[in-house]
Structures are given as structure tokens and as C-alpha cells.
């Protein structure tokens, strides 16, 4: 494997390991500071909004100033964010930490993605981006597991460790990453108004609505999950880490071994509908579960539906985009970020009203997603009949 590709993968792994590390300790951390579910929603939303705003500028700056520089700046901001969260003793400091963390993600991700595109042979780009996705998932899976066990020492320790990982990634990037002499700006092109008139916007309406609705529901559930289990059955950070890591492993296994097989037998829309119905059933079981082991077992399988929906939507966008792959990817990313921003805000407020309210909302949103899919399938069937 190319040395620079390996370093880029390692950087991404460290970043997402660092993000995952802190998930199991958030309930203890919030209670220690006397914060509520609404406060947690604000912290998560601040990160998502900051990333959404900075990402386009991060991509443009990466092209103008060099991707290595933007990656390194992003890694430093990541470390600053984690150390601030570790020492923070009031809500304002934590909010500032999350804003800086979102800025770091908005710089590192476009930089890494662009650099992988630059240094990958054309026949290996798809494979390299596939590896990147798998590595991101691996960081999310291992992070909560490690963080939960670190919390046995101190609930602030995972944040210090994540900050240290950022510094390690920064040093490796300084030493081992080099900007190529020739670089591509694909994916960060300037928006030309005349191009917009050539785009068939109608084909993107339903995917955009579906992406917004689903990211809204999924982020709402995932944001409050650790707080939900801690309050409902008194899960410790270690218990939360086992639940999330187990769920992540099962989700990854289904993605790796079964997603392609399902796609041979189902269209993306049909598969999304079935995945949503599966998620609804499991979420209903979660509402009725009231003891340690039943919630642990449900936790191992609840994320499978969500983990299958995401690549299916991405695949659907890609298939309808034609030659507008960059445009479709931008729409997908933008509306996913919007959902990730709005979902935690509402879920946090609902959690303070009733512990099960965010779960009810996720169930309702998932059912709305099924309805949207059925409407889209009916619309496409009519178009197909008209074209015959």
C-alpha cells in the first residue's frame, strides 16, 4: 500500500477513534456538570453545524493552500477541541470545544478525501474510498469500547487520550504526507450558475427529502442512546461501550457480508423500506425492554438497520445522478448534515420531557421514510409505464 495512503487512513482512523472514545462517558460527564438532554443535543448540533459551514471552505482552501496544510490545521483543531472538553467545567467551554471540533472535521475530511483522489490511480480510487469508509466505521466501533474502559479510571481520560491521538496524527502528517505536484480539484469545483439549468432537479427531490428525514431520525436516536440507556437501566460507561461496540460490529458485518447480496435481489428503494421497517420493530422492542440484558441484546441488533440504510441511500443517489456524481454527493452530504444538526436539538428537548420521546420520534420518522419510499416507487412505476 502507498505510504501516504496508509498515513491518511491512519489519520482518519485516529480521528474517528477519538470521536467514538467519548460516547460512553457523556452521560456521566453531563451529570457531573448538571447538564440535561437538551444540552447534549445542543453540543452535538453545534458540532454538526460547524462542520456543515466549514466543509465547503475547507475543500476550497485545500485546493488553494495545499491539502497537507489543511489536514494538519484540522488535526491541531481536533486536539484543541478534545483537550478543551477534558478540562471544561461549564457549558460555554464545552460548546466552544464542539464548535472547534466541527471545524476540524470540516477541514480534515475534504483534505483527506481530496488527497486520496490525487494520489490514487484511477482504477484504484473506488477501492481506496471503500477502504476509507471501512476505516471510519472501525474507528467508531473500537472507540466506544476503549473509551468505556478508560472511564473506569476517569470519565475525563478518554478526552485527553483523544487529544493525544490528534497530536500523533499531526506529527505523522507533517513527516510523511506530501502534496502531489499535480492535484485535482474535482469535488471542490466552483459553482457555475449556468450548470444549474442543465440539472434535472426533479429526480433529486425525493432522495433529498428521504436523506433529510432519515438523517434527522437516525441522529436523534444515536445522539441520545447513551443517555437513554444510562437513565433507563443505569448503564455505566463500560456497559454503554459494550453495547455500542457490539452493535457496531454486527452492523459492520452486515454491511460487509450481506449488503451487496441484498442489492442483487432488491432495488435501493425496496431495501431502504425493509430496513426502515426492521428498525421500527427493533425500536418498539427497545421501548418495552426494561432490564439490563434485554436492552443489551437489542443494542447489538438495533444499529443493523441504520447501518444498511446509509450505503443504500448513497447508492441510490449515485445511480440517479448520471454524470452529476459530484453534485449528487454534495446534496447527500448537505442534507445529511442538516438532519444531523436538527435531529439532536429536537431529540434533546424531547428527552427532557420524557425518556422514551426520542425513540417515539425515531419510530415516527422511520415510518414517514417508508411512506416517502412507497410514493417514490409508485411515481417511478408511472414514469416507466409512460416511457414504454
From Swiss-Prot:
The chain crosses the membrane at residues 5-25, 42-62, 69-89, 99-119, 129-149, 157-177, 201-221, 239-259, 269-289, 293-313, 331-351, 355-375. It is found in: Cell membrane. One of its GO terms (molecular function) is xenobiotic transmembrane transporter activity. It holds the Pfam family MFS_1. Gene3D superfamilies: MFS general substrate transporter like domains. SUPFAM superfamilies: MFS general substrate transporter. It comes from the Bacteria. It is a multi-pass membrane protein. One of its GO terms (cellular component) is plasma membrane. Keywords: Cell membrane, Membrane, Transmembrane, Transmembrane helix, Transport. CDD domains: MFS_MdtG_SLC18_like (cd17325). InterPro entries: MFS, MFS_dom, MFS_Efflux_Transporters, MFS_trans_sf, Multidrug-R, Tet-R_TetA/multi-R_MdtG-like. The keyword Cytoplasm does not apply. Involved in quinolone resistance. May constitute a membrane-associated active efflux pump of hydrophilic quinolones. Belongs to the major facilitator superfamily. TCR/Tet family. This is Quinolone resistance protein NorA. It comes from Staphylococcus aureus (strain COL).
Amino acid at each position: 500500500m502507498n505510504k501516504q495512503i496508509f498515513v491518511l487512513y491512519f489519520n482518519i482512523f485516529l480521528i474517528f477513534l477519538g470521536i467514538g472514545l467519548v460516547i460512553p462517558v457523556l452521560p456521566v460527564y453531563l451529570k457531573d456538570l448538571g447538564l440535561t438532554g437538551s444540552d447534549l443535543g445542543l453540543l452535538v448540533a453545534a458540532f454538526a453545524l460547524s462542520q456543515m459551514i466549514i466543509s465547503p471552505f475547507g475543500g476550497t482552501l485545500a485546493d488553494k493552500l495545499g491539502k497537507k496544510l489543511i489536514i494538519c490545521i484540522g488535526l491541531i483543531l481536533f486536539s484543541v477541541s478534545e483537550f478543551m472538553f477534558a478540562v471544561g467545567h461549564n457549558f460555554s467551554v464545552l460548546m466552544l470545544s464542539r464548535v472547534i471540533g466541527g471545524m476540524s472535521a470540516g477541514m480534515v475530511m475534504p483534505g483527506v478525501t481530496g488527497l486520496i483522489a490525487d494520489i490514487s490511480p484511477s482504477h484504484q480510487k473506488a477501492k481506496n474510498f471503500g477502504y476509507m469508509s471501512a476505516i471510519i466505521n472501525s474507528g467508531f466501533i473500537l472507540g466506544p469500547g476503549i473509551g468505556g474502559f478508560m472511564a473506569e479510571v476517569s470519565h475525563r481520560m478518554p478526552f485527553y487520550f483523544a487529544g493525544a491521538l490528534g497530536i500523533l496524527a499531526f506529527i505523522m502528517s507533517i513527516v510523511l504526507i506530501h502534496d502531489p505536484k499535480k492535484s485535482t480539484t474535482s469535488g471542490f469545483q466552483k459553482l457555475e450558475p449556468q450548470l444549474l439549468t442543465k440539472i434535472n432537479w426533479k429526480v433529486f427531490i425525493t432522495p433529498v427529502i428521504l436523506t433529510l428525514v432519515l438523517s434527522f431520525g437516525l441522529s436523534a436516536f444515536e445522539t441520545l442512546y447513551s443517555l437513554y440507556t444510562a437513565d433507563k437501566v443505569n448503564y455505566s460507561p463500560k456497559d454503554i461501550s459494550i453495547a455500542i461496540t457490539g452493535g457496531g460490529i454486527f452492523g459492520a458485518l452486515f454491511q460487509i457480508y450481506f449488503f451487496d447480496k441484498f442489492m442483487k435481489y432488491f432495488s435501493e428503494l425496496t431495501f431502504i423500506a425493509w430496513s426502515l421497517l426492521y428498525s421500527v420493530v427493533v425500536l418498539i422492542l427497545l421501548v418495552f425492554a426494561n432490564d439490563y440484558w434485554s436492552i443489551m441484546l437489542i443494542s447489538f441488533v438495533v444499529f443493523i438497520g441504520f447501518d444498511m440504510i446509509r450505503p443504500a441511500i448513497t447508492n441510490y443517489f449515485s445511480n440517479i445522478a448520471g454524470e452529476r456524481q459530484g453534485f449528487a454527493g454534495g446534496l447527500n452530504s448537505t442534507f445529511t448534515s442538516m438532519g444531523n444538526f436538527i435531529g439532536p436539538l429536537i431529540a434533546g428537548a424531547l428527552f427532557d420531557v420524557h425518556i422514551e420521546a426520542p425513540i417515539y420520534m425515531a419510530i415516527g420518522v422511520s415510518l414517514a421514510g417508508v411512506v416517502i419510499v412507497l410514493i417514490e416507487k409508485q411515481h417511478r412505476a408511472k414514469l416507466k409505464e409512460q416511457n414504454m
